[in-house]
Structures are given as structure tokens and as C-alpha cells.
């Protein structure tokens, strides 16, 4: 047993998967999952990879895989082009450093590979994925690939908060201004309280740590920084909200739960 005066939960997030025909084929996985495999030494040099879904993680994954020799043929972002341009304008005001980092990506690479307003509708193959069918809502086409890295954003990891009995609201852990949960002396920080990115998670962690140590006045001085990061998170959530078509990709034959084969 480990005794404690205060408990701070920082359980993070996990990738959101939406079922579509062929999504259980080998070599169809989340972008974050494929990155973890590559970090562990999994070879992807020369392999054709389609990265698909929504959110900033797609581009990060594509650049990471490219640096390790993979041939990223497409980056399919389901958000429409106009939403991405609107986000870029807002980021220039809220987080200019983020825009400069994005501008550091070779423009020719972006032009060739990023496809806004597109999403996968089916993966095909026998022993592993061999191709993916893509649509932009009006036409469809097929791309050959060795890997399909696909996830539709992130969702809070709530297993531990649920086991402890923390109050959950809007699919995230409820916290007050000092990151306190509904349970006495239990705090929560980061993506478990809502997807807001690493910078917001760091500030939330500092607030939770100070509050747990009884330094609430010091924690209050970080409220402004947290509010700025949360405004940025709201802009990202609005941009990358899922289109309705993604919820109807599964057919009667599509396996919804691969563990139970349902």
C-alpha cells in the first residue's frame, strides 16, 4: 500500500477509431501506434503509408515516418480546406509560434501529400492491407499502400478516473479552477480533463501540483496561461470536428469490436 495526502491523475488520451470496412486488417493502425512501433525499431523504410483521419497528429506522424524512410503517399484530413485556412488565421493571433513551425514544413511536400476534405471509406487486402478507397464526398479513388495509419483525433483516457468514481462530464473528467475533481484530495490534469494539447496539459499539471501542495495563490497566477491554451484548444476542436459521413462508414458486415468479433 502507498499512502498519500493528495492524488493527481494524469492519464492522458488515446486515439479515436471509427469502424469502416477493412479497418481490422493487419497494418491498419493508429498514427500514434505506428509511431510507437517505429520508435521500437519496426522497419518502415521504403514502405508506402497512407496517413488518414483528423487533427495535428496526422502531419506529425507523416513527417516522423518520412524521416525514417517511409514513403508517405497521402495525408487525408477529413476537415474541409476552408476550416483549415480559418484555423491558420486564428493561430496567427493565438499561437504564432505554431504557425512558424508549420511553415517550416517544405511547401512542395504539403502540396503533394495533404488532401483536405478527404477520408478513407474502406481498406482492402488479404493477409494485410494492400490498398485503401478514399472519398472527398463526391468522387472515390483507390490508393495502394503497405500501411494505413488512421485515427480520428483523441479521446480522454478515463479508466482510472472511472474506477475511482470521479465525476465525468462531456466525456472528460470534471475539475474546478484548481484542477480538483469531485473527490476529496484527488486532482486531474491534462487530456483526461478534455483534449487541449501538451502545452495546456503542462500548465494544468503545474496548477494541480501547486494546489495539492496548498499553494493555491501561486496556482491562481497560472489561470491566465491555462485560459489562453484552452482558447487555442477550442479553435482546434471546432476545426477538426467530425463530419457526419464518418459515422456511417460501417456496413452490416463490418466488425465493430475486434476483441469480441462482433
Where are these regions (language model features)?
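C-terminal accessory/binding modules appended to enzymatic or scaffolding proteins
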Residues: 245-262
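Flavin (primarily FAD) binding-site architecture
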Residues: 11-23, 154-165
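Glycine-rich dinucleotide-binding loop and its adjacent helix/turn
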Residues: 13-50, 54-61, 169-178
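A conserved FAD-binding loop/helix module that cradles the flavin
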Residues: 189-225
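FAD-site-proximal beta/loop scaffold in flavoenzymes
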Residues: 29-38, 121, 128, 147-196
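Long, charged amphipathic helices and adjacent flexible linkers at domain junctions
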Residues: 218-250
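A Rossmann-like FAD-binding core segment of flavoenzymes
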Residues: 66-159, 167-170
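Short hydrophobic core segments
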Residues: 2-12, 144-153
